[in-house]
């Protein structure tokens, strides 16, 4: 049954994504950058909604009040990264327009990448660390000044459940330099949509949003350790069996 459900979902994505991407590229000719984000975000909302009846994947959000308390502040979100699910869900579920930092190779994906290129995101060349750091710093400052929230995955890539990769300091460095608040997010999306897995597992993805962390008078190293400590401790709360 899971194979059938996952296959139906894949067929939906293969058919719907190119159609929506073409619609986006046409609509973007007449929309402001802010309205482009809203328009393309409808795809995310549809996908997240469809995953419930089709694959049995639901979600639960804990700590949303921590975001609503700082809606008018400069914020950098640092999130655990396990799955494609959270990258789709954040645009659909979070209350503020996000600016993702992502590898430029995503722009080369037919249809999806082409539409993505028309949004004000930060795409980096991960093979050149110096250039990537400069892009995050310069574009990040600009996007924060426009009122957007910056979204980064400090581990840099998706990690299997129960594992941790070294946290990179790019997001913490940007927060420290701009005096932005940092909101950490832990989740267990890898349980339902594992990395590199075609099969989608039914279950509930828990998103745990932490209290905003001040970057004032903190070095990037101090801030990074505080964020990592909160996320990894919270991971053991929402998914304890993964760490036994």
Give each language-model segment a name:
Residues 49-59:
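Transmembrane alpha-helices and immediately adjacent membrane-cytoplasm interface residues
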Residues 21-45, 53-54, 69-129:
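Catalytic core of membrane glycerolipid acyltransferases/transacylases, capturing the structured
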Residues 61, 77, 100-101, 207-209:
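Generic preference for hydrophobic
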Residues 1-29, 38, 42, 68, ...:
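Membrane-interfacial terminal anchoring regions of lipid-handling membrane enzymes
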Residues 65-70, 199-200:
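A short beta-turn/loop motif at secondary-structure boundaries
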Residues 3, 134-244:
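Non-catalytic C-terminal accessory region of glycerolipid acyltransferases
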Residues 49, 88, 172-173:
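Active-site phosphate/pyrophosphate- and oxyanion-stabilizing loops and adjacent acidic/basic residues
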């Amino acid at each position: 049954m899971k194979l059938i459900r996952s296959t139906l979902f894949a067929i939906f994505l293969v058919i719907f994504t190119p159609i929506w991407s073409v619609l986006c590229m046409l609509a973007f000719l007449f929309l402001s950058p802010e309205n482009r984000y809203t328009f393309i975000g409808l795809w995310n909302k549809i996908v997240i909604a469809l995953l419930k009846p089709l694959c049995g994947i639901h979600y639960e959000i804990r700590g949303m009040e921590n975001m609503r308390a700082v809606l008018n502040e400069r914020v950098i979100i640092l999130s655990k990264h396990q799955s494609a699910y959270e990258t789709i869900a954040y645009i659909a579920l979070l209350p503020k327009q996000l600016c993702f930092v992502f590898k430029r190779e995503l722009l080369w994906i037919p249809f999806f990448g082409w539409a993505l290129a028309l949004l004000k995101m930060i795409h980096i060349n991960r093979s050149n660390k110096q250039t990537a750091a400069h892009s995050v710093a310069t574009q990040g400052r600009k996007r924060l000044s426009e009122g957007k929230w910056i979204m980064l995955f400090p581990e840099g890539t998706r990690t299997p459940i129960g594992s941790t990769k070294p946290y990179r300091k790019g997001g913490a460095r940007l927060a420290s330099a701009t005096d932005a608040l940092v909101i950490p997010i832990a989740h267990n999306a890898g349980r339902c949509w594992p990395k590199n897995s075609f099969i989608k597992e039914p279950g509930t993805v828990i998103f745990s949003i932490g209290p905003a962390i001040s970057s004032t008078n903190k070095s990037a190293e101090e801030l990074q350790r505080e964020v990592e400590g909160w996320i990894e401790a919270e991971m053991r709360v929402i998914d304890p069996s993964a760490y036994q």
